[in-house]
């Protein structure tokens, strides 16, 4: 009887233990399945020393909150209207981090290890092969028609060109929408091939294709070289009333002035007339000086008309070859899009961001550091000061000398410099904005895995940010050089005129040899 009671008690205890164990097991399975159903992204840590550890829930939650806050800040500050963006990517998508599960089997199932090379991809691939849940998954790329690839915007050629003159006798032009468009697909190409570790051969191929694109583009640009060189010659006339750097001042004369005055003024007397007008700047209303001033004013006006005509002619030439330029842009687009469409992941739910990281390290990081090492705002301040001081000096000289061809020349150069400054200011704002945005987005994009669809959006987004940043950085540097090339020549003219006034007010007879001595003993600003 006692033995039967003991047996009955043990049976009851066993049944209770079985029920409790079953409930615990079902609860664990339910928890795991809930995590599986909601999982979109798992973070991968960025330090080699911590690769055997996994961050706990609090750390990840804190990181999520910081990431979301950074995204809000970026969205609020990105006001650039430089080139219309065709990417409708919402950077908040795909950033739903979950706590890492506590079950080792769950972690092993998805091979979430802190590796950033092909070893990680191999682990993912092997796990997927051994996983019944993923045997029927289609690993082909998603439908690329859903992505809004960048197109050439509707633009007016005349309003979309920066004309650059980085040094005297040289002139170049940049069609800004083309530059940004080509750069966008260049970075899309590199981001795509860098997604895999073994990219050396592909990288060489991309470099070669981009070099070919650039050469073809320059070849089309060269079709306007004759018009461009003609414009350079006219600019030289405008900026050099006569060549003050030439020891033989008689060697530079206005042939155009003979046409204006119906050859009434002999060429051999022109230098003497300029000297006389310098001596008599306070007597501009005398009959002889009035005639000379009228001649100079008409000469300058005709040169300005010539300048505007030739500039329009250059723009027309560029527009005439617009189809050739557009074809080159489409070739670059097709090439970059093709590489992008070949991008694949071993596991579509866990695509790593090696490509974004490697491309950033290789091409962008050095540029970011270079920009941050410069004080772009100080550059703007210095240029503003130059423009203000030169305008003040111009006003004073104008009062002293009245109508004088050098004054018109200074006004022309000064107007050009103000336009160049406005362009530099414009590009500087874009550079500052994009530097901050790129750095913030890189923090969110690297050392992580994404679902494939989200990774592709991010590659498009980063390529867009890079192209805007690099276009403005390149153009700002060329415009900067152009500004100081003009400023150097402006200084030369100012020095000459100040010297003239000093001689005049000291009652020293003005002869050309004095100016030669001045140039020899006091080198003009370099």
UniProtKB/Swiss-Prot annotation:
Highest classification ranks of the organism: Eukaryota, Sar, Alveolata, Apicomplexa, Aconoidasida
Region Disordered, annotated ranges: 259-294
InterPro entries assigned to the protein according to its UniProt record, in alphabetical order: Rh5_CC (IPR041668)
Compositional bias annotation for Acidic residues: 259-279
Species of provenance: Plasmodium falciparum (isolate 3D7)
Name of this protein: Reticulocyte-binding protein homolog 5
Signal peptide, first to last residue: 1-24
Disulphide-bridged cysteine pairs: 224-317, 345-351
Chain spans, region Mediates interaction with human BSG: 33-51
Entry keyword set: Cytoplasmic vesicle, Disulfide bond, Glycoprotein, Host cell membrane, Host membrane, Membrane, Secreted, Signal
């Amino acid at each position: 009887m006692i033995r039967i009671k003991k047996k009955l008690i043990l049976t009851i205890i066993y049944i209770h233990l079985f029920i409790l164990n079953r409930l615990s097991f079902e609860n664990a399975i339910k928890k795991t399945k809930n995590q599986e159903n909601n999982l979109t992204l798992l973070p991968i840590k960025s330090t080699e020393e911590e690769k055997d550890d996994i961050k706990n829930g609090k750390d990840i939650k804190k990181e999520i909150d910081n990431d979301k806050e950074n995204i809000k800040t970026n969205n609020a500050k990105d006001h650039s209207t430089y080139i219309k963006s065709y990417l409708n990517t919402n950077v908040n998508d795909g950033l739903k981090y979950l706590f890492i599960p506590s079950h080792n089997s769950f972690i092993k199932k998805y091979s979430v290890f802190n590796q950033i090379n092909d070893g990680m991809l191999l682990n993912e691939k092997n796990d997927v092969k051994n996983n019944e849940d993923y045997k029927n998954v289609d690993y082909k790329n998603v439908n690329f028609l859903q992505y809004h690839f960048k197109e050439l915007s509707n633009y007016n050629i005349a309003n979309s060109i920066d004309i650059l003159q980085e040094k005297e006798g040289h002139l170049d032009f940049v069609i800004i929408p083309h530059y940004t468009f080509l750069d966008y697909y260049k970075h899309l190409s590199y981001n795509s091939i860098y997604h895999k570790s073994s990219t050396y051969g592909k990288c060489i191929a991309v470099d070669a294709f981009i070099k070919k694109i650039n050469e073809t583009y320059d070849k089309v640009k060269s079709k306007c070289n004759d018009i461009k060189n003609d414009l350079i010659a006219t600019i030289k006339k405008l900026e050099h009333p006569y060549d003050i750097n030439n020891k033989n001042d008689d060697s530079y004369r206005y042939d155009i002035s003979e046409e204006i005055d119906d050859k009434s003024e002999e060429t051999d007397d022109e230098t003497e007339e300029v000297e006389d007008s310098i001596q008599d700047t306070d007597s501009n209303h005398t009959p002889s000086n009035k005639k000379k001033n009228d001649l100079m004013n008409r000469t300058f006006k005709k040169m300005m008309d010539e300048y505007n005509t030739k500039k329009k002619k250059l723009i027309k030439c560029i527009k005439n070859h617009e189809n050739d330029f557009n074809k080159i842009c489409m070739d670059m687009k097709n090439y970059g899009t093709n590489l992008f469409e070949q991008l694949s992941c071993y596991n579509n739910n866990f695509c790593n961001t090696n490509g974004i990281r490697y491309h950033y390290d290789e091409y962008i990081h050095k540029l970011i550091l270079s920009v941050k090492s410069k004080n772009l705002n100080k550059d703007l301040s210095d240029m503003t000061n130059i423009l203000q001081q030169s305008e003040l000096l111009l006003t004073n000289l104008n009062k002293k000398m009245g109508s004088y061809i050098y004054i018109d020349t200074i006004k022309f150069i000064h107007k050009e410099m103000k336009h160049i400054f406005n362009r530099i200011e414009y590009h500087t704002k874009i550079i500052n904005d994009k530097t901050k945005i790129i750095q913030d987005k890189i923090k969110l994009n690297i050392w992580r895995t994404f679902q494939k669809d989200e990774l592709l959006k991010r590659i498009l987004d980063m390529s867009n940010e890079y192209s805007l940043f690099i276009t403005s950085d390149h153009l700002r540097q060329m415009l900067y050089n152009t500004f100081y090339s003009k400023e150097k020549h402006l200084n030369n003219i100012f020095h000459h005129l100040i010297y003239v006034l000093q001689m005049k007010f000291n009652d020293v007879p003005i002869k050309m040899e004095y100016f030669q001595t001045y140039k020899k003993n006091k080198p003009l600003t370099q």
